[in-house]
Amino acid sequence: MLRVFLFFFLSTFCIQAQSIEEIRKAYTTASESKEQKERFYQLMQGAAMDTSVKEAYKGASLMMYSKQSGKLRTMLKEGKALIEGAIEKEPQNIELHMIRLSVQEHLPKIVPYRANIEEDRKFIQDHLSQQPQPLKKYIENYIND
């Protein structure tokens, strides 16, 4: 009985232990196809929400996948709340601003979630040079796309 419990516990832990690098890679390819969007959504559904950055990526996954899911309004609202909640917790985190910027820039204009585009661009521009190299390169790749 203890072995069964231990197996399920470790299985659950391993499934939820996605690295931030894996999440970033999935996020950058999510807009390429419906399959990639669904893959990113599924990845974030299984990810432990142990950081504000992961919360924001989960919010982005909900917003990206909302059209495919048939729960457009609900998922857009929930995704926005996760992104805004993450930024509220860590307002100086540049990656959170990049996530919100990328979401707001790519949502259809009919969706009323576009108020922070200029604010986030300026924040990123002002703080990018101070970031560690891997994060700096990741954000530069988004900006230069």
Label the predicted regions:
Residues 1-20:
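Bacterial Sec-dependent N-terminal signal peptides
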Residues 21-34, 63, 67-70, 105:
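Specific register positions within alpha-helical solenoid repeats of the TPR/Sel1-like families, i.e.
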Residues 28-42, 72-80, 113-114:
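Helix-turn-helix repeat elements of alpha-solenoid scaffolds
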Residues 45-48, 81-88, 126:
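Conserved structural position within tetratricopeptide repeats
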Residues 115-145:
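Terminal, low-structured helical/coil segments at or just beyond the last alpha-helical repeat
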